[in-house]
Amino acid sequence: MRTAVDTGTIQEYMACLSEKVRRLINAYDMEETREMICEAMKEYPDAAQPHNLLGILMETQGNHVSAMKHFRAAWVLDPTFLPARENMENFGSFSKPGAPAYTMED
């Protein structure tokens, strides 16, 4: 397991992970994306961000049901993590979804 000493802070690690995942999804490298997210989930099982990112990946691959499960898991783990809530609202509506929220800045 990584520690805060290994990676700076958990927040910095998650911010870096989010940006890497965004780039990999945009480059259609789904396998590496999944591996990176799953590793983060193992290292930080209580973090909302990896679930949100896996939800984005699932939605990108057309697996809406799994995507919504991971967005909900992220929201349950951290109700203050707004990207998960935004993605649930965005992808759970009947209108055409907008861009996914990877970070608080999205």
Locate the predicted segments by residue.
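TPR-adjacent "capping" and linker segments in tetratricopeptide-repeat scaffold/adaptor proteins
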Residues: 1-16, 39-42, 98, 103-104
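Helix-start (N-cap) detector for alpha-helical repeat units in TPR-like alpha-solenoids
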Residues: 14, 48-49, 82-83
